Amino acid sequence: MPSPCPYLKDRDSRMEYRYIDGCDFAVNDALARRGFRRFGKYFSKPNCAGCRECVNIRVDALNFKFNKSARRTMRKNENTKIILTKPLIDDAHVALYKKYHKFMQEKREWKYYELDFRRYYELYIAGHAEFGKEIAYFADGRLIGVDLVDILSDGISAVYCYYDPDFADLSIGRYSLYQQILLAQQLNLRWIYLGYYVKDCPSLAYKAHYKPYERLCEYVALDETPVWKKAE
């Protein structure tokens, strides 16, 4: 059934869902390359009649060049501690998630949903198997950012990132993407699967700034080969 579009006002959206209990590396890999996004054990992608504004993009990590702005962001975070681990859940994670979303409700008019431990587990811990990872960011021992990712055969899928708005000067959102790119380079994985780019949605339009990147050309079924093309 159609529901209000979360990205563009005055539009409806229709999502295609898959629930997979015990998803393995190969299945998650295939779904990500066909435009599905994973949250816990649920996989989804838009399938809206007459609208193709949600465009899946993947950044070419092995050919990405860090410009002056990127290097400046890296320097600002010289004292930021980074820990790569399996996805975790505790009071600090849930509190930071809520703080970030309340901030985005005020800044971008995001709809705020109350979230407890159970809901956080269902969205970000369940189903991570061997491919789900967490990149956690700390300042003076305090958790200030969480970047949840999936490791794929040819890249890294960006699942979700949230951070402490009190540390906005560190640009943790951008910094986390740069760290994904560096990790992909270390692992010799070419792509960062960034999810949906929507040119008229401020929360998603930024993704086109990270070049070079490719676009998933069109809706692709599970039994079809995905076609990605380099963006001009």
List the model feature ranges, each with a label.
Residues 135-219:
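Aromatic (often tryptophan-rich) hydrophobic motifs at membrane interfaces
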Residues 25, 91, 174-178:
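A structural signal for well-ordered alpha-helical segments within the folded catalytic domains
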Residues 3-5, 13, 118-121, 132, ...:
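Short secondary-structure boundary micro-motifs
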Residues 1-81, 86, 190-232:
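Terminal substrate-recognition subdomain of acyl/acetyltransferases
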Residues 32, 102, 185:
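Short polybasic/polar patches that bind polyanions
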Residues 42-50, 59-169, 209:
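A conserved beta-strand-loop-helix scaffold within acyl/acetyltransferase catalytic domains
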